A protein has these predicted regions:
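Intrinsically disordered, low-complexity terminal tails and inter-domain linkers enriched
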Residues: 127-165, 301-313
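Membrane-proximal helix-loop-helix interfaces that form the catalytic/acceptor-binding platform
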Residues: 1-128, 165-530
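Short, solvent-exposed mixed-charge patches
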Residues: 532-534
């Protein structure tokens, strides 16, 4: 799904800001709500290949493929081939990851960097533990660690406090990259560093100097952006768009990896897709119940005299599954911190789209636990059901992404603008004009910057195609004749801008057409209006 030419608003922002210099990206990005490392990466590509959506999408896909490769490399070596293969499978076929992997945004790369950071922090902790054993740790052979499935031979590698220096460097660099890619990356990297610090203080104080040096360098390199963060936090607190809708928000938090918009609206594509998803759900439920029953029966036979709850706790908290606990704790920590921040800032920032930043450690947990399930029927059934949902999700995404309907409103806008000698084009909906500013660069457009905060500064990324005004009067002052108004609605209807302008005594609507745009699942309106008098 990377060869289509469509973008939605967030993607349009990535594309537009990449056309600026590194310094300009830093400045313009200060008005946005994300750090700028991803935009810098796009700017490098733009300098080499020009504004090329295919190149940008391949770049984002590379982030997910890098995540999948961790399964075949780091995870396979640390936790066994089963866990590695499962992790790669989930990285490539989790429906939501498949969707964002072709979206021109920073998520695929921040998921990779957070996961890489977490894995190497775990490696460092395990190595320090093996070299600083305590009574009660159990028998630890030289170079062997019971928290990992493989031993590491450090001969020939430069070490800092008994740990290969390259591991420290990978951990510190991926931590810094996470922070410069997304603010949830900041949260994840902070918790990873914090938990490693606690472990070092408790078990390997000799390594404290290395950790502190790395932490100080990270903070020093991130300090310039902290100046920007303060202003961005003010924007989020005062004018952020996200809000709670019960129970939808809770459902999104819990099930977003598989419960994508394509799965939710599968019935609008045909009953066959609903039937397939229903079969997948039944197969998953039956497989899970079969596996659980089989597991409890086997361990009750091996552990007579113990309660089932104690057996379950013993297996879930077994040493071999501690890395899975690490993944869940990290994910839960980020979620909790974001929830607390939302309460403090009185603005919802616990958005499922942001939670996916730490989905890598969560997938690691699932992969490790599944790798310890002995029932092949259970595992195969779960994976088959998961793959079925993923295929349906991808088929529907491709159907929407490559639909010719996506181009209809853009073509009509260009035709209307051309036939009216490039008139004034207005909208207060940046979701529409962000897209048209990228897709129809030859049409000058004007945006009504109504939002409080610093958003208008962020939208300078669309200059010179898009310019801003503070009111309709400012846009129409001294103007006479035909102009175009753009709008977007979730259901078919008249956009608010058209209604507002039509209510003026000096404005009338002469033509209006509405198009369904499958890629965004919204209705796109192009209205031709005339202003009489001065």
């Amino acid at each position: 799904g990377s060869f289509h030419g469509n973008v939605w608003f967030d993607e349009s922002y990535s594309v537009s800001i990449a056309n600026n210099s590194f310094a300009e990206i830093w400045d313009i990005g200060s008005g946005d709500v994300h750090p700028v490392l991803f935009y810098w990466g796009l700017h490098v590509l733009e300098s080499l290949f020009g504004q090329n959506l295919l190149v940008y999408r391949l770049f984002t896909i590379a982030g997910i493929f890098s995540l999948a490769m961790l399964g075949f490399t780091v995870i396979r070596r640390d936790f066994g081939w089963k866990a590695g293969v499962l992790f790669s499978f989930f990285s490539l076929f989790t429906p939501y990851l498949a969707y964002i992997s072709v979206e021109i945004r920073m998520y695929s790369w921040v998921i990779f960097s957070v996961t890489l950071c977490a894995l190497y922090a775990w490696r460092i902790a395990c190595t320090l533990r093996s070299k600083n054993p305590r009574e009660g740790d159990g028998s630890i052979e030289e170079g062997q660690n019971w928290w990992m499935s493989s031993a590491y031979d450090g001969d020939g590698c430069r070490e800092w406090c008994g740990v290969p220096c390259r591991w420290w460097l990978v951990m510190f660099l991926s931590s810094l990259a996470s922070a410069y890619l997304h603010y949830y990356g900041v949260l994840a990297a902070s918790f990873i560093n914090l938990y490693l610090l606690i472990f070092i203080i408790a078990r390997a104080k000799k390594a404290l100097s290395v950790f502190i040096a790395g932490a100080v360098i990270q903070v020093a390199l991130y300090a310039p952006w902290l100046m920007v963060f303060k202003s961005q936090a003010g924007v989020v607190s005062g004018s952020y768009w996200a809000n709670v809708s019960f129970p939808r928000t809770i459902v999104e938090w819990l099930f977003y990896p598989v419960y994508t918009s394509y799965v939710i609206f599968a019935d609008t594509y045909g009953f066959g897709y609903v039937l397939i998803l229903t079969v997948c759900a039944v197969v998953a439920a039956v497989s899970a119940l079969y596996g659980l029953a089989n597991w409890l029966r086997r361990f009750k036979q091996q552990n007579t005299g113990f309660k089932e709850s104690l057996i379950l706790a013993d297996r879930v908290l077994a040493p071999s599954t501690l890395p899975a606990i690490w993944g869940v704790v990290l994910y839960a920590s980020v979620f909790t911190a974001a929830l607390v921040a939302s309460i403090v800032m009185d603005s919802l920032i616990v958005y499922y789209r942001y939670l996916c930043v730490t989905i890598g450690p969560l997938l690691l947990a699932v992969s490790i636990w599944l790798s310890h399930v002995n029932s092949k029927v259970c595992v195969r059934g779960l994976l088959a059901a998961f793959l079925g949902v993923s295929i349906v999700n991808q088929v529907l995404f491709v159907q929407d992404a490559y639909s010719g309907k996506n181009e209809e409103p853009l073509d009509y806008l260009e035709e209307t603008a051309k036939s009216n000698s490039r008139p004034l084009v207005l909208s207060s909906d940046i979701g529409v004009e962000g897209v048209t500013a990228v897709e129809c660069e030859n049409i000058k457009q004007t945006f009504l910057a109504w939002q409080p905060g610093n958003w208008a500064h962020a939208y300078q990324s669309y200059f010179p195609t898009l310019t801003s005004v503070k009111s309709w009067d400012a846009a129409l002052d001294g103007y006479q004749g035909t102009f175009i108004v753009l709008g977007q609605t979730q259901t078919e209807g008249v956009p608010v801008d058209v209604r507002d302008l039509e209510s003026r005594d000096d404005v009338e609507v002469t033509d209006m057409k509405t198009f369904y745009r499958p890629y965004e699942r919204t209705w796109f309106t192009v209205a031709t209006m005339v202003k009489n008098g001065n």
